[in-house]
Each structure stands twice: as structure tokens, then as C-alpha cells.
């Protein structure tokens, strides 16, 4: 049985920069597009040493992460492509009481929607388009620990308002 516990006092500092802009100034049909960008930086003064003397910070926190989204939307069609990325981070302790880290990870997602009428919409969503895998290491990057393939997930739905 494992659980996460508070690490005691620490200071977490960070900054988030966000930009969102509909591109209505462009000629048709590009005037129905838009862009959204986001960057986050976090830093903590918490530094713990593992049983083997390797430093780890806050669990599940990446120092850097960003998201980029392009979208299109008109009366009938909506489309969105998004890329999300995060730095490596301290994940958990292994059974040997060593630190497990996840390497940097990025994922591309795409979604489409078509409005047949105002009450009937078909949607297609594809997550992890590039079939990116999560990679883990133990304390130093050269010490491979695991590989988790998330596969590409495709969802299709039809929504009808009665």
C-alpha cells in the first residue's frame, strides 16, 4: 500500500504565460481560425535526497510545460489540433526505495466536429496521434526503468438534443 504525503514546508514559485487570439483579421476562410499558447515554469526550494543520495524535488511537478492549440470554427465545422509537452519529473519511489523519474513527454491531439443541424453534432477525437510512449528511469537517465505505451485513442460520437 502506497500513498502520497505532504513533504513539509516548501515554497513553490512559478509563472504562467498565456496567449489566445482569434485570427479574425485574416481573409476567409482563415478568419475562422485561432491560436492559443501557454507556457508554465515552476520552481520549488524543496530538495530531498533518496536513499542512494540522488536529489529529488516535488513529486509530479515539471519545471517547464507548454501547450499549443490551433482551431477552426464556423457554423458547421469545428476543428482543433493541440500539442501538450512537459519536462521530466520525479514520479515516485520504486520498490527498492530509489527515485523514479518520467522523461519529457509530448502528446498531439486532434478533434473534429460537424453540426448537421443545431441539434445534431458528430464528433471525432484522436488522442496521442503520434502514439507517444512514456519513458521512465531510475535516478539517472542512463538507468532505464520502464516504457509505457499509451496507444492512440479514437472516439466517435453523435450528440442529439431532443
Where are these regions (language model features)?
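Active-site lining segments that contact anionic ligands and/or coordinate catalytic metals
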Residues: 65, 76-78, 105-109, 119, ...
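Residue-level preference for beta-strand/loop junctions
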Residues: 11, 31, 62, 104-106, ...
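Outer-membrane beta-barrel proteins
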Residues: 8, 99-101
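Structural motif
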Residues: 73-74, 102, 116
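Gram-negative outer-membrane beta-barrel transporters
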Residues: 2-93
Amino acid at each position: 500500500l502506497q500513498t502520497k504525503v505532504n513533504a513539509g514546508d516548501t515554497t513553490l514559485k512559478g509563472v504562467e504565460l498565456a496567449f489566445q487570439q482569434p485570427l479574425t483579421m485574416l481573409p476567409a476562410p482563415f478568419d475562422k481560425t485561432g491560436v492559443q499558447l501557454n507556457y508554465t515554469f515552476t520552481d520549488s526550494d524543496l530538495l530531498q535526497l533518496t536513499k542512494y543520495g540522488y536529489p529529488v524535488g516535488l513529486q509530479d511537478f515539471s519545471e517547464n510545460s507548454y501547450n499549443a492549440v490551433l482551431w477552426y470554427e464556423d457554423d458547421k465545422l469545428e476543428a482543433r489540433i493541440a500539442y501538450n509537452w512537459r519536462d521530466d519529473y520525479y514520479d515516485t519511489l520504486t520498490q527498492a526505495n530509489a527515485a523514479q523519474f518520467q522523461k519529457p513527454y509530448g502528446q498531439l491531439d486532434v478533434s473534429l466536429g460537424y453540426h448537421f443541424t443545431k441539434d445534431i453534432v458528430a464528433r471525432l477525437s484522436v488522442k496521442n496521434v503520434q502514439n507517444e510512449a512514456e519513458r521512465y528511469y531510475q535516478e539517472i537517465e542512463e538507468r532505464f526503468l520502464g516504457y509505457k505505451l499509451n496507444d492512440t485513442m479514437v472516439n466517435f460520437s453523435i450528440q442529439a438534443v431532443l
